[in-house]
């Protein structure tokens, strides 16, 4: 399958979101246990039609969202995106499939997307929110240079400048 590569890191190709990966997207977002770490708790599956609309909307908007594909195998790793972006700041979001976790892809992806955001998109500030009990993600974000700047019972807010 032909996917347009936007940028790369050592082990990851960052490609445009595409309907070719729809099955992988659905598997990832409907893994209720895994998705609880980055979207929150829910019990219903996301239907295929809704996910197709999401992909098409992101493509039409030319949104800065990328699917991550393993260079060596071509397997889907997850998605990473900038949300609520203005000319100098954006919120970072990342989702990695359960089977590709604990393999170093999170740190590599966060480092690469931060570099892309600052160098290619001209961002001066990148921020994110993470659940306080998601210690693996917090550790990765800290390793990539993010620092906590606020906290509530539900979220920790981190940024890199």
Language-model-derived ranges and their functions:
Residues 1-52:
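A short, well-structured alpha-helix characteristic of acyl/acetyltransferase catalytic modules
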Residues 41-93, 97-99, 152:
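Acetyl-CoA-dependent GNAT
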Residues 124-138, 143-161:
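C-terminal "cap" of GNAT-fold acetyltransferases
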